[in-house]
Amino acid sequence: MKSLWNDNVAKTFANDPLQLRVYTSQLLGREAGLVLHGGGNTSVKVKTKNFFGDSEEILFVKGSGCDLSKIQISGFSPVRLEVLKRMATLDRLTDTDMVRLQRSAMTDSTAPDPSIEAILHANIPFKYVDHTHADAVVAITNNKRGEALIREIYKDRVLIVPYIKPGFKLAKKIYEMTHKKDWKRFEGMILMQHGVFTFADDAQTSHERMIYLVSLAEDYLQKQGALDNVARSEAKENLFKLSKIRRHVSRIKGNAMLVKLDQSSEACGFAGLSNVESIATCGPITSDHLIHTKPIPVILGKNVEKEITDYSSSYKAYFDRNTDGHLTPLDSAPRWGIWPQYGTIAFGRSIKETIVVSDIVHHTIRVIQWGEAIGGWKALSEKQIFDMEYWELQQAKLQRDEISPVLQGKVALITGAASGIGLACTEMLHEQGAAVVGLDINAEITQIFNQRDMVGVHCDITDDRAVKKAVEMTVRCFGGLDILIPNAGIFPDSQRIEDMDENTWERSMDINLSCQQRLLKMCIPYLKEGIDAAVVFISSKNVPAPGPGAAAYSVAKAGQTQLARVAAMELGCDGVRVNIVHPNAVYDTALWTAEVLESRACQYGCTVEEYKTNNCLKTEVSSKDVAELVCAMVGPAFAKTTGAQVPIDGGNVRVI
């Protein structure tokens, strides 16, 4: 591992130890082989003056859960050093009381909670302290010969600490091991089955000691051939089965979950190992990952429903074996899975969660194989894993009410998403928690929606291959499909039947009806495996109340409505709801050009303004109004409604 330290950059912070701490923390955070997603912690000890002008020593320690790769000064918690030092001398301290004491010793109440290892940082007698969960090091510490290998690699350079649960007990143990020792003898600490600490009175030395100690571990693994001991193979694909996996995991979890499928050669290689079940189900590479991954993955095969159900039962038995009778069980759904021939799968309530889990899994499968190559991978004991997963601070979080967006974890596909009603629906579905894929013939769609959970796809809905590819991409990206909004359509120029050219008629029938049927047909297999799946067709007031000169449009939309009604009957037994909205006078859509408005007003013998407010409520209906109705119809409010036609038109007399 190479140091990313840059003298020229560091010089700009020479007189600001806290800003220098930010800089070196970010350097560590950018190395995925050192820390992942909120893991690790750093600190700096600084003398400052309080409100009374008195000098105080303050430990600025990384706030709990803050990401080192992006941390700023606001991500550090300022805690009075003397209080933290005295805490280490206590005989007993619950973790809950530890957190309270640490917060009471903070000099800024708006800062995040200090790291649970703040006491440990405080009692290391150096200005700068760095802590990581380096892959190379934990591959060696989590080994049947772990301590012997660490001594062989580091000799007397480091203090070796046996595994103890992070928090007060770990800080107390290290305090007892070192309070009569000369810290200058050590370049760092290796915490068995946990990670690495380095320290120094200047930031560069502490940082480069970390890189050096990790490099020694990497060199050892390289010499043993471990770094090359990573299986690889090509992936197969079964998107329908993927959607079934997601459905069953969501059922166990009790809410919709997103999926991130890793089909990389490394993921497929690991999943295909003959001994994968035994080596992958020992436990995490560091207890820090438990909050994201649970103790072990689910192993998937031919009968995914049974395998996921068995995993749930096994997790409940694990809880029953270890609980003291006063703990609240976590849900029993897996957070990742091993799918032989297909790769690894991460599950999460949001795309952010799935990315965190997937990244951890990517490193986990490497570290396990490295460990196997040097004598045998060995994780923590079941009891140690349980104690960490169910420690009191985690239990306290269960008592807090977490309000999730109503569509959190759902997957939605919308056509005609670049403007008007489609744009509004896509944005609002995303706001309400869904991962969304928007299709449009406008190439700018890829720029309009370019987030990880809000994807724009350039697609002509008359191109069946392109539509099929987009549907499959949706399932591949998020694991399934729950919401379908067929919105794309055209509004032909006004033509009376006797004057209508064949192309106008055929084009309207193709885009407004036939394409909708083909899209629905492609999506049905995935919708049947969806979570409370729902389809909402964006139809038109022209179905219940057609107007002269709009035969091509009205007939196609009427056909679309009949398609939706039949679909509601056919799919009801599979739990898929199909409803229709009939908007009218939504003038912020691409359909309503100035020319179209003028033409329609002429048909009714009125001005454009009179035409736009021609409803009982004398109000205009916006795309956002339609989107709000659509979101309600795919949500729990309409959970027991299917086959319904709901007008949203301000009260059209002819419809009423």
Predicted regions: what is each one?
Residues 1-412, 424:
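Glycine-rich flexible loops
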Residues 407-436:
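Canonical Rossmann dinucleotide-binding motif of NAD(H)/NADP(H)-dependent dehydrogenases/reductases
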Residues 491-494, 638, 642-656:
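Short C-terminal tail/terminal secondary-structure segment
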Residues 495-497, 501-506:
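Substrate-binding pocket helix/loop in short-chain dehydrogenase/reductase
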Residues 525, 569-570, 639:
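Alpha-helical segment proximal to the catalytic Tyr-Lys
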Residues 536-559, 564-573, 584-587:
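Catalytic loop of short-chain dehydrogenase/reductase
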Residues 572, 577, 641-643:
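Short, small/polar-rich loop/turn modules that mediate ligand/substrate recognition or access, typified
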